[in-house]
């Protein structure tokens, strides 16, 4: 019998090893947080920077790395339009801080890059997007359950790790139970067809394009 899988939820993970990048990012983000009170979005007890991060020259190297990663994803996902890096921001979660469950509307792909993350500093949790699947909870055999049968997934933060996923995927960040701050950078990618809508209805939205 042939088995076919439909409606998958792709999550891309890469561990980047850019010498000196995280040290530079940590220094600049902490300095930014000292001069800007930040925003309140899904963050609880944490600092959320303004969302114009991609336009600041000190973050250009990371922006270029994100473009490279997104180019690969667009090719693998058979997307045939121009891609744009939309808003991008930094997060500082001190011990006890977390982020409530949310999605990223008006975007296509979302992601997070970890600048500093100790063990137990808060997993990224994503939920099964198939709402109808929650009506049944079949009993599973003993042993490891294949990821295609999970109802939620947890991703460990690690300095230098990049995780990218569809913007419609509900996700949250567990509390930071380490004894130090956790620093991450979040961002959203779009397509050319989404540009006009965002320009008309969204304020302070930075758009950067590249060709694939």
Tell where the protein language model's regions lie, with residue ranges:
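Non-heme Fe(II)/2-oxoglutarate
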Residues: 1-80
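A generic structural micro-feature
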Residues: 4-6, 82, 103-107, 177-181
